[in-house]
Amino acid sequence: MNQGKIVQCIGAVVDVEFAREEMPKVYDALVLEGSELTLEVQQQLGDGVVRTIALGSSEGLRRGMMVTNTGDQIRVPVGTKTLGRIMDVLGTPIDEMGPIGAEQNRSIHQKAPAFDELSASTELLETGIKVIDLVCPFAKGGKVGLFGGAGVGKTVNMMELIRNIAIEHSGYSVFAGVGERTREGNDFYHEMKDSNVLDKVALVYGQMNEPPGNRLRVALTGLTMAEHFRDEGRDVLLFVDNIYRFTLAGTEVSALLGRMPSAVGYQPTLAEEMGRLQERITSTKSGSITSIQAVYVPADDLTDPSPATTFGHLDATVVLSRDIASLGIYPAVDPLDSTSRQLDPLVVGEEHYSTARAVQQTLQRYKELRDIIAILGMDELSPEDKLAVARARKIQRFLSQPFNVAEVFTGAPGKYVPLKETIKGFKGIVSGEYDHLPEQAFYMVGGIDEAVEKAKTLQ
């Protein structure tokens, strides 16, 4: 084992000097003598000095401390032994339930699958959430982004998706908590436990109180575990909450490594780092990874470099809107801004496609008329426009839905709505079958039959 000594510490970045002929390679893991702290080599500065990131707290480090080169990259446990466990960035269990005992370890730095190994799928993944299944359907083996500013419901949507898909899909899932609140990680663990799906989920946490090195690498740790399940021939779900914190950790590290910042202070390697992560999240001929990623949007600005870079990698984008949340409509998904490559008559069928487009056209017409209504009132509209507004308001309310994971807050039991029910309901509203019902009947219900029942109690 090669040994070196610390020559400089600046926050999470540590410079270590080795003998010139024993200089570690980039991404080698170094271990601090007499401590659990792992350092990952990022740059070779020459003359035997390497610049590393500390994957843990760098408190108490001082010059002259001895460091050992393991001669290998960071390796984490993979396989079924990781299911039901909570691990950190290094794959160390943090749930106080003893060692993982996995038979296999795998490096967190892997090459993306070769072009000829990839496979495309058009099979739909039903989520049971009306607005998502209708206007931005997910593909099995696809990549989905949940975009939203602070407090519009990304994590709640994510938890509902995990609950619905984990229960209905009955496959394995990996959840990577990247720089999010520890409380949410705890809530999520108990939610999985109560739903009896914990034995199918591997949890990897690097929360917001941890150093930037942990937050930068924890997404790769979760991805490595998911890749192993995929390579075994399984269909696996990978949830990342939140991909923006991965970028932000990269920004913190980049500045400490001495790189010049680019637009809005982001790292100059933003597109490359994101690309390297996203290209590994893909489906091959042996198995599939369906990935759902929450993306924080700074100051609700979708043109910010971080969310803008993420957009290009996704098959479906679910955009959460503060305006819709302020109306009390949850999930606050914007049906006009959200898109999916699967919304194609050849994939979803003509009925689904035409219903989704009719819903969007009606909502778009209402959006255009809103200014006129605000200035002149409803009476100035033509009869056709009045009808369009009435239907749009019903659609808007019918897009809301009570969630299972929010039941403890709202007291309303959650609803899972099958795709057939969703299409039937919206088709009926658009074609005018339910024009006689009051719009309140459509708010926070599951299928259309519930809305009809609710209308009877309102009359």
Curated annotation (Swiss-Prot):
Disulphides: none
Residue positions binding ATP: G148, G149, A150, G151, V152, G153, K154, T155
Subcellular location: Cell inner membrane
Membrane topology of the entry: Peripheral membrane protein
GO cellular component entries: plasma membrane; proton-transporting ATP synthase complex
Subunit structure: F-type ATPases have 2 components, CF(1) - the catalytic core - and CF(0) - the membrane proton channel. CF(1) has five subunits: alpha(3), beta(3), gamma(1), delta(1), epsilon(1). CF(0) has three main subunits: a(1), b(2) and c(9-12). The alpha and beta chains form an alternating ring which encloses part of the gamma chain. CF(1) is attached to CF(0) by a central stalk formed by the gamma and epsilon chains, while a peripheral stalk is formed by the delta and b chains.
Family: Belongs to the ATPase alpha/beta chains family.
Protein name listed in UniProt: ATP synthase subunit beta 1
Gene that this sequence comes from: atpD1
